[in-house]
């Protein structure tokens, strides 16, 4: 076999959402911080295109690049590449990365509990892994500070009329709509319509509401639309359905850890969730993430919460992505039959 490029990947999924991890073959990008390195990847695009575009990737795939940490307290660092964005943080991807690091032996596992610190582009996240028989069975992630931005904002969406939405940040930026008010019961056969409408709502929110992180001037758009199910109080705590539309038009198979963090921030801002509560988010495929609020803080003078999320991930395989020098599509390709819901 001849190849001008070979990238080594361990594939994984967290509660259904693919989060592959590049473990070799890619040099650390330039930049003095992990955030600056992630901005270089977002601008330069070559690596993103190679691993996310067909024939090696697709709209269903997220890919994480392991890089040497910059912060002295971090055990490892990672840069998240999603279909359209290179975000500050991701819940499902942090769970995949933690699982790959421990299950593959890149970082030493200690049973029954391993504690590590990861450096995401948006900052440090503390991780606690429950481990047994050489497997990281459940990952607990102390996510970035999360906050409600707007409550009950009015958003005009062409063809849908005026919607009442919340906006929030949970490590990534969300516009949140009431799923029931949109006519959704959050069932698997609604995925196409949720993806299609969610992209329209996100685009409208970017055009008419806008988002600016108060401490990160580079992050100034909404990434996702969360269709939020009703919150029910059970013997085990709070429980709610969740479906997140991801650009350019797919639904997260997991309950989305940053969405869970954003929703907890909104519920706390409304006085509907306290530090003693636990919220379980349920995805369209029935997988779950669990969340709780560890404390409160401020982000740019705005009230915020310190969320913890937890979930499971599994390694699905190993891959070597190669580039034959005669391949006429060195960065791959994409078509609108899959890249963008209509």
Swiss-Prot record:
It is an enzyme of class 4 (lyase). The active site is at 90 (proton acceptor). Gene3D superfamilies: Diaminopimelate Epimerase, Chain A, domain 1. Transmembrane segments: none annotated. Belongs to the proline racemase family. The keyword Plastid does not apply. Pfam families: Pro_racemase (PF05544). SUPFAM superfamilies: Diaminopimelate epimerase-like. It comes from the Bacteria. Keywords: Lyase, Plasmid. Its EC number is 4.2.1.77. It catalyses: trans-3-hydroxy-L-proline = 1-pyrroline-2-carboxylate + H2O. Catalyzes the dehydration of trans-3-hydroxy-L-proline (t3LHyp) to Delta(1)-pyrroline-2-carboxylate (Pyr2C). Can also catalyze the epimerization of trans-4-hydroxy-L-proline (t4LHyp) to cis-4-hydroxy-D-proline (c4DHyp), albeit with 150-fold lower efficiency. May be involved in the degradation pathway that converts t3LHyp to L-proline, which would allow R.meliloti to grow on t3LHyp as a sole carbon source. Displays no proline racemase activity. This is Trans-3-hydroxy-L-proline dehydratase. Induction: Is slightly up-regulated when the bacterium is grown on t4LHyp or t3LHyp as sole carbon source. GO terms for molecular function: 4-hydroxyproline epimerase activity; trans-L-3-hydroxyproline dehydratase activity. Substrate binds at residues 91-92, 252, 257-258.
